[in-house]
Design a protein with these regions (language model features):
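Non-heme di-metal
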Residues: 1-117
Length: 117
C-alpha cells in the first residue's frame, strides 16, 4: 500500500477504496484458504468475516467518491436535516450552511443528521 502519499480527498478515497477492494477480494480470502488448508477452521472463518467488513469499507469509500464527483457532499436533491458536528446546530434544507450560525464553524463541519439510537 502506498505510504507517505497524500493526495486530494478524492484521490485518497479512490486509493483507499482500491486498497479495500484488494483486501476483501484477494488478501483475506487467500489468508482464509491458507488457514483452512493448515487446519485452522476458526481462523479461516475469521478471515472470511474480515473480508466481509472490508467489502463494506470499499462500498462506503466509493459512495464518498460519488458524493464528491457529483457535488453531493454538502448539497442534496431534496431537503435533509444537517447537523453541525461541532456544536450540534440543526438546519433543514437542500444545502448545509456555509458557516454554522451558532458556532461559526465552516460548512465542512456539517453532516447529514443521523439518528442511530
Amino acid at each position: 500500500y502506498p505510504a507517505g502519499v497524500i493526495g486530494t480527498t478524492l484521490e485518497n478515497l479512490q486509493a483507499a477504496a482500491a486498497g479495500e477492494h484488494e483486501e476483501w477480494s484477494a488478501d483475506y480470502p487467500k489468508f482464509a484458504q491458507i488457514a483452512q488448508e493448515e487446519g485452522f477452521a476458526d481462523i479461516a472463518a475469521m478471515y472470511r468475516n474480515i473480508s466481509n467488513a472490508e467489502k463494506g469499507h470499499e462500498e462506503r469509500y466509493r459512495a464518498f467518491v460519488k458524493n464528491i464527483e457529483t457535488a453531493q457532499v454538502f448539497a442534496k436533491e431534496g431537503e435533509v436535516v444537517w447537523q453541525c458536528r461541532n456544536c450540534g446546530y440543526i438546519h433543514t434544507g437542500k444545502t448545509a450552511p456555509k458557516v454554522c450560525p451558532a458556532c461559526l464553524h465552516p460548512q465542512a463541519h456539517f453532516e447529514v443528521m443521523k439518528k442511530n439510537w
